[in-house]
C-alpha cells in the first residue's frame, strides 16, 4: 500500500523525519503502522447539545474499518455550534460562521499532519456542510458519515419533534395552550441524542450527502441510537481506503451532475432552504458553476414526494423504516430526474448503486409518494426575484399552503424587534413582516429566524402572514417565508428601502417578489439611505463581516474556489 502513502511518507518516512515519528509512537502507533496509509477521522463532538453527543463512539468503529482495510486511523476534532440552543439569541450569529470555520480547521489539521485520506463524522446543521466543503477543498480520498437523528418523541398518539417545542411557544403566547401543556411538549419532544428529527437542516444535509455521492448509500436515515450507525461507521472506514485505491477523490464526485442530483433531492423532500446556501458553497469549493439559476430551473420540474416534517407529518425515523434515502433516490432515478452517471465515493456511478438497491418489503404508508402522483405537485423550494431581491431570494413552499401572498409591510431592523411584535399581538392577518439587517454582513452571520416564524405559526397566523428577511430560516420553518434576500440591507439592497405600509407581492409560482413602489420613490429613498456602522469592530464577527459574500453566492468566506 505504499502508493497510498503519497502524503504521510513526506511527514514520517526516512532519517530526516525521525523526530516526527516519536509524536505518533506516543499516541500508540507501532513500527508497522508507519508503513500503512494514515487516515484522519474527523469528529464533531460536544456535550453542549445532543446532535454530536454520541459521535465519539463512532470514531472507534471507523478506525476499526480503516484497520480492516490496511490503514491506521487517528482522530481529530472540530468545533460545534448548536443552532437550536442559539435560536433567537446573539449566539445565532455564530451558526453560519461555524460552517466556514469547520472547513478551515479541517484544512489546517489535515494539511499540517500529512494524512493520506479521511472520514468526516458530523451531526448538526453546520458541521455537515463544513465537512463536505473541506472534503472538496482538500481533495484527498474522503467519506462523509452522519451521526444520525434523534428519535421522535410521543405525547399520547402524537409524534413530536423539536418543531413542536418551538411552535408551542407561539401557541402559549396566543393563549391556545396552557403553560403545563407547553412544559409537557418541552419534556417529550427530544427524547434521545442525535439531530433534530424532521427533514430539517441536519437531515437535509445528510440526505444530500447520499445524493451528492459523498456518503455511503443508505447511511443517512438510521437513527443515532441504531446499531446500524456503527455498521456504517465500519463500512465508511473501509470505503475510504477503497476510494484511495481507485483514485476517487471528492472533486471527481462533486460535479455539476452530482449537484444537480442534490438539488433534485432537496426539492423532492421539501428540505431546508439552508441547503441552497450550502450547495452553493460546496460548488464554490469544487470550482463548479452552479447558481441560483440552476436551482430555479430544476425546481420547476420536481414535485415533493416525501411527507416529512415540516412539509408533512413524518420524521426521519419513519422514512428509515421504509428504506431511507435510497428509496427516495430510486423513485427519482426511475422517473428520469437524476443524472445516473454521477460518480460516488463508493467508486461507482449513483445509477448503478440504485439499480442494485432493493427496497424492503414495507408499505410506504403515506410517507413517500410516486413522482407521477406526488405529495405536492410543486417543488419544496422556489427561487424568487424582483425589485425587492434583484440577486434572488429563497421561498420554502413545500411547507406552505399558499404560493401567493399580497400584503402591507411591517418593518423591523432586527429579529428581536420582530419577536417582541409577535409576542405583543401586533402582527395581524395581511401583514408582510420585513426583518432586515440580519444578512451575512449586517447581523453579521445571517442568523435563522425560527423563534419568530414558529411564534407566527403557533399563534395561528401561518397562512395569514408572510415574512421576508435577508437572514435565514431553520429547516423546521413553515408558513409563507422568504429568506436569503440579496443584496442584503447592510450593503444597500432594496430591502433596506422598504417602509411600513408598502405593498409587497410574493408569488411562488411565478418566482416573483415585488415591492409596489415606483422607481422614482425608491431612488429618492436610496439617496437618503446611509449604511449602518459595523456592529463589531474586532474579533471573529468583524472578520467574518469583512470577508463574507452575499447569500446568492453561498455566503462563503474563501476568496478562492481552490483552497489547497
From Swiss-Prot:
Protein's UniProt name: Dihydroxy-acid dehydratase
Residues annotated to bind [2Fe-2S] cluster: 51, 124, 196
Catalytic activity: (2R)-2,3-dihydroxy-3-methylbutanoate = 3-methyl-2-oxobutanoate + H2O; (2R,3R)-2,3-dihydroxy-3-methylpentanoate = (S)-3-methyl-2-oxopentanoate + H2O
Source organism, top-level taxon: Archaea
Keywords associated with the record: 2Fe-2S, Amino-acid biosynthesis, Branched-chain amino acid biosynthesis, Iron, Iron-sulfur, Lyase, Magnesium, Metal-binding
Pfam families in the record: ILV_EDD_C (PF24877), ILVD_EDD_N (PF00920)
Binding site for Mg(2+): 83, 125-126, 448
Enzyme Commission number, as recorded: 4.2.1.9
In-chain residues carrying the UniProt-annotated modification N6-carboxylysine: 126
Active site: 474 (proton acceptor)
HAMAP family hit by this protein: IlvD
Cofactor: [2Fe-2S] cluster; Mg(2+)
Organism per entry: Pyrobaculum arsenaticum (strain DSM 13514 / JCM 11321 / PZ6)
Pathway it works in: Amino-acid biosynthesis; L-isoleucine biosynthesis; L-isoleucine from 2-oxobutanoate: step 3/4; Amino-acid biosynthesis; L-valine biosynthesis; L-valine from pyruvate: step 3/4
GO BP, sorted A to Z: isoleucine biosynthetic process; L-valine biosynthetic process
Complexes and interactors: Homodimer.
One example GO MF annotation: 2 iron, 2 sulfur cluster binding
Cofactor note: Binds 1 [2Fe-2S] cluster per subunit. This cluster acts as a Lewis acid cofactor.
Main function: Functions in the biosynthesis of branched-chain amino acids. Catalyzes the dehydration of (2R,3R)-2,3-dihydroxy-3-methylpentanoate (2,3-dihydroxy-3-methylvalerate) into 2-oxo-3-methylpentanoate (2-oxo-3-methylvalerate) and of (2R)-2,3-dihydroxy-3-methylbutanoate (2,3-dihydroxyisovalerate) into 2-oxo-3-methylbutanoate (2-oxoisovalerate), the penultimate precursor to L-isoleucine and L-valine, respectively.
Family (UniProt): Belongs to the IlvD/Edd family.
